[in-house]
Amino acid sequence: MSGWIIKARRTPGVRAVDQGGPVLIARETVFDRDEMFALYDSVDWDGYTSDVDRMMRGLANSHLVITARDESGELLGMARTISDDAAVCYVQDVLVHPRHHRRGVGRALVEHLKERYAHCRFFLLSTDHESTEEGRRNHAFYRSLGFLSYEEKEMSAFGLPRVR
C-alpha cells in the first residue's frame, strides 16, 4: 500500500478503485468530529447533524465503522454496523460524499461489510421508501448488491414512529 500513511486509529483493509484512483477501505475507531459532520452534512442527514454529540456517540458505540479514503486521506464515504457478530448485523449507515457518487465507493463499503458479516444469519438494513427519489436510487443500489426487500424474503419489519 505504497503512498499510504496509516495512523494508529485505522486498521488497513481492502483496496478498491474509484474512477479517481485507489481507495482504501479501513476500520476506524477514532473519529474527527468536523470530518464526520461534513460527511453527514454533505448528504443532508439532518437527523445526525442536528445533534453532533449524539452522532459522535453513535459512531463510538457502533460495532464496526469502516471508511473509504483516497490516497491523500480524504474521507470519501463510510459505513457502520450494529451487530452481535453472531446472528444479526444491521447496517446502520452507508454514506458517500456526493462528489464521489457512482464511482464504486458505496459498493466497496457494502461488499466489505457483506464479507465481514457473512457468518451472520441476518444481514439487514433500512432505507427510504421507494416512492421517494432517494428511495428509488437506494433500492436500485441495494438490489444490485443482492439485497431483497423483507416482503420478498417473506419477512416483516416493524418500527416505532420516528423520534425527532
Describe each model-derived feature in a short phrase.
Residues 33, 49-53, 107, 136:
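Structural motif corresponding to alpha-helix initiation and N-cap regions
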Residues 3-49, 153:
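Short amphipathic alpha-helix that is part of the acyltransferase structural core
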Residues 107, 119-124, 129-163:
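Conserved active-site alpha-helix within GNAT-family acetyltransferase domains
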